Amino acid sequence: MKMDSLIKELNLLWEPVRPFLVTQIEELYGRQDGHILEIGPFGGLIFALARKNVGKSFSIAAFPQAAIALYRQDARKHGLEDRVRIIETNSSLTGIVDESVDLTIFRGALFFPAIFQVDFKAIYRVLRKAGIAFVGGGFGKYTPAEVISQIRKRSEQLNDTLGRARVTIESVRDQLRSSHLEGCCEIITEGGLWVVMRK
């Protein structure tokens, strides 16, 4: 399968998880305003946030190339092509203005080094003061077991085909240390492996 087909299937498969992950993100963010940025190919959470009116403006930092057309299709499907701006970029967030984002979401960030490397410094750079980033992966703490069980096997197959790496808490800590950002980040393991970054 081509990468765009794999990404498309994985994002469709995860649609039932989105409302539950969004609940966790809403809880962390604690606001209804601000600019929200979703990063990378494994997304769609931004559409759920926009429909719930969590945030005032919305952008997607779309990469790799295979993900860009998929996001445009998704925006049309959800009737949000006028509200969600799709920016062609890379994992260093080239073209995203410094200190312009209040909430950043990057699902799948830690697990696909064959496709991209997570750039924690870039994520910190684009956050406004008091901004928050939710970076990592997993089903989230509110997704019911029955929803997880329906998609787990196929999700694992697709992730493995895309080159998912096994990541430890210590390896994530090492990345944060090397980025000199460990002081503003918390690693949480409830519902996956996530880094919560606060500026």
Segments the model singles out, each with a brief description of its role:
Residues 35-93:
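Class I SAM-dependent methyltransferase SAM/SAH-binding core
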